[in-house]
Amino acid sequence: MDLMPLEKARAIEIAFDNVFHNTKIPDNLQQFDAILKRLERRRFIPTENQKPRVYETELLVLRFREFGVKDNHNHPINLHSLRSKSLIRAQGKKLDLHNRVFLRRNVRAVKM
C-alpha cells in the first residue's frame, strides 16, 4: 500500500471530537515539541480501500480554550505552523503543562 507521509498530504482534514479526552501530559515544552515533530515522520494508516485513498493518524494538541467548550469544526492544518504557534503560545502564556488538557484528534489525509 502506498502510504502517504503527513507532511506531503495534499489535503489534511482534522475531525475534532465533541468529547475531550485526557491524555498523558508532557512535562515540558521540549517533550511537547518532540511529539509534534514525530508526527512528521509518521505514516498514515489506510482506513478503507477506496478512492480517493484516505489515511488516518492521531494528533495531540494542547487545548488553549476553557474546558467544556466544543470544538467541532474542520479545517486544514500545517504541522510546522502548528508546532511553532503552539510553542509560541505556550511560551508567551508561560503555561505549566502539568495537568493541562490535550485533545486527541483524528487526522485524515486524502490523496486525490
UniProtKB/Swiss-Prot annotation:
Its main location: nucleus. Keywords: Cell cycle, Cell division, Centromere, Chromosome, Kinetochore, Mitosis. It comes from the Eukaryota. It comes from Schizosaccharomyces pombe (strain 972 / ATCC 24843) (Fission yeast). The keyword Cell division applies. This is CENP-A recruiting complex protein mis19. One of its GO terms (biological process) is cell division. Component of the CENP-A recruiting complex composed of at least mis16, mis19, mis19 and mis20. The keyword NADP does not apply. The gene is mis19. It is found in: Chromosome, Centromere; Chromosome, Centromere, Kinetochore. GO terms for cellular component: CENP-A recruiting complex; chromosome, centromeric core domain; kinetochore; nucleoplasm. Component of the CENP-A recruiting complex that ensures the integrity of mitotic spindles through maintenance of kinetochore factors mis6/CENP-I and cnp1/CENP-A. Links mis16 and mis18 to recruit CENP-A through interacting with non-sense-mediated mRNA decay (NMD) factors and the SWI/SNF complex. Also links mis18 with the CCAN/mis6/ctf19 complex to promote CENP-A assembly.
